[in-house]
């Protein structure tokens, strides 16, 4: 079963699984890495990169057959694609659709860029970041991962 969407792009629907839509252009492969999806997986994965968005501009999109995302996976995706939407598909129909939300505090997900931070030493301390107007700030050493940096490099 294949359907064409208005701009001429043909994308196969999935029977059951998850669609991650409105991913920041160029971050689709980062989303796959966050989800641990690698070459050789036996799961059907569809990636559309830099396609026109109904909201205007461009987007990436990922479809994953027979998998529903966990909350911590959605939280990680929100860091690289804050405007993304997650749709749960059941029997070819959208069962649940909701936007991702960037958590106010991110614990144990982001690696601090400061090599001297207590979270990067041999101490058993999880990283802890808070959302800052210019990016994400480490609560231990005050290092900033700015909006200009690629947050995907620190996940």
UniProtKB/Swiss-Prot annotation:
One of its GO terms (biological process) is pyrimidine nucleotide biosynthetic process. The keyword Transmembrane does not apply. Gene3D superfamilies: Aspartate carbamoyltransferase regulatory subunit, C-terminal domain, Aspartate carbamoyltransferase regulatory subunit, N-terminal domain. The keyword Disulfide bond does not apply. One of its GO terms (molecular function) is metal ion binding. GO terms for cellular component: aspartate carbamoyltransferase complex. Pfam families: PyrI, PyrI_C. HAMAP family: Asp_carb_tr_reg. Contains catalytic and regulatory chains. Belongs to the PyrI family. Involved in allosteric regulation of aspartate carbamoyltransferase. This is Aspartate carbamoyltransferase regulatory chain. The lineage of its organism: Archaea, Methanobacteriati, Methanobacteriota, Stenosarchaea group, Methanomicrobia. The gene is pyrI.
């Amino acid at each position: 079963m294949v359907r064409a969407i208005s701009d001429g792009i043909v994308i196969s629907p999935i029977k059951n699984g998850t669609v991650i839509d409105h991913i920041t252009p160029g971050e689709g492969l980062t989303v796959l890495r966050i989800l641990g999806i690698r070459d050789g997986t036996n799961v059907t994965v569809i990636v559309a990169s830099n396609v026109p968005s109904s909201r205007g501009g461009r987007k990436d999109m990922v479809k994953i057959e027979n998998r529903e995302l966990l909350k911590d996976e959605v939280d990680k995706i929100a860091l690289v694609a804050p405007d993304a939407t997650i749709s749960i598909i059941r029997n070819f129909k959208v069962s649940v659709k909701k936007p991702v939300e960037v958590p106010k505090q991110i614990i144990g997900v982001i690696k601090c860029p400061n090599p001297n931070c207590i979270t990067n030493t041999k101490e058993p301390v999880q990283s802890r970041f808070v959302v800052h107007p210019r990016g994400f700030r480490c609560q231990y050493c005050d290092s900033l991962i700015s909006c200009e940096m690629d947050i995907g490099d620190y996940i």
